[in-house]
Amino acid sequence: MMQRCVWRLQMPLALRRGLASGEAKNQGVSPEAEPLDSFERQYLKDRIEISPFQRVILGAGSSIAALLDPRRHDMIACLGETTGEGALENILDTMQASEEGQRIMAEKPRIHTSTIDFKLLESLPADSFGAAYVKFLKDNQVTPDSRMAVRFLEDPKLAYLMTRYRECHDLIHTVLGMPTNMLGEVAVKWVEALNTGLPMCYGGAVFGAVRLRPKQRRAYLKHYLPWALENGKRSKPLMPVYWEKRWEQKLQDLRAELGITVLNKV
């Protein structure tokens, strides 16, 4: 497994960067490079290069900081990038295995207020996924523009997948019917962990639960945790879902398609 990951991180990256023929030959790769798209070009300009040792230090430091203060979203983001390459490789395989996932990787859509027509979503039927997403944002007073940029991943394709994961987080909340309070966040993290395999999701689920108050913890253990584990194991892969093409779909139908059930009010 380790050999497979090393090959995929070194060889395709050299190709995707569009190295000159001489450089490509020196690195033992074919000079025919896969052209970079706009996301990949911009990412390679902005990314921060770190050594394997620096990656270990960043991973350890960010995990401690995130544990001490879960509000440090910058540390949580750093932890996700320094520990998630293996899981992202598996997610990439999943994306490439479906037509919908392939389309996402080819088009690399972004989720911002500048890319989503929220007036259109507000005009959709109340039982549609798009209308439910707008309601979720308003009810929880959140915005899709608050996600941190990816900086520490080497492979731009994996960087896009991490970006996509972050920008789709509120969409996962919506389809799961979970609010952004502590109980809701921990439950969603369990579903994401089991669905994506990202270590930071497991960390957020485990350590987030530790910080629950006694009353919350009882509800978590009796209702939220069993529900989250069941949905995380049973649901179809969520990363290959082209959410932006599902706005008009009935939320109930989308949940049925993905194998998701909603937690009854407790």
Curated annotation (Swiss-Prot):
Please state the pathway this protein functions in, per its UniProt record.
Cofactor biosynthesis; ubiquinone biosynthesis
Query: Which EC number applies?
Result: 4.1.1.130
Detail which positions bind Zn(2+): 169-170, 173, 185
Q: Tell me its cofactors.
A: Zn(2+)
Q: How does it sit in the membrane?
A: Peripheral membrane protein
GO CC term (a single one): extrinsic component of mitochondrial inner membrane
Pfam families in alphabetical order: Coq4
Q: What class of enzyme is it?
A: lyase
Alphabetical GO biological process terms: ubiquinone biosynthetic process
Q: Which UniProt keywords apply?
A: Lyase, Membrane, Metal-binding, Mitochondrion, Mitochondrion inner membrane, Ubiquinone biosynthesis, Zinc
The record ties this protein, via InterPro entries, to: Coq4 (IPR007715), Coq4_euk (IPR027540)
Compartments where located:
Mitochondrion inner membrane
Q: Which reaction does it catalyse?
A: a 4-hydroxy-3-methoxy-5-(all-trans-polyprenyl)benzoate + H(+) = a 2-methoxy-6-(all-trans-polyprenyl)phenol + CO2
- Assembly and interactions? Component of a multi-subunit COQ enzyme complex.
Q: What does this protein do?
A: Lyase that catalyzes the C1-decarboxylation of 4-hydroxy-3-methoxy-5-(all-trans-polyprenyl)benzoic acid into 2-methoxy-6-(all-trans-polyprenyl)phenol during ubiquinone biosynthesis.
Q: What else is known?
A: This protein may be expected to contain an N-terminal transit peptide but none has been predicted.
Q: Which family does it belong to?
A: Belongs to the COQ4 family.
Recorded protein name is Ubiquinone biosynthesis protein COQ4 homolog, mitochondrial
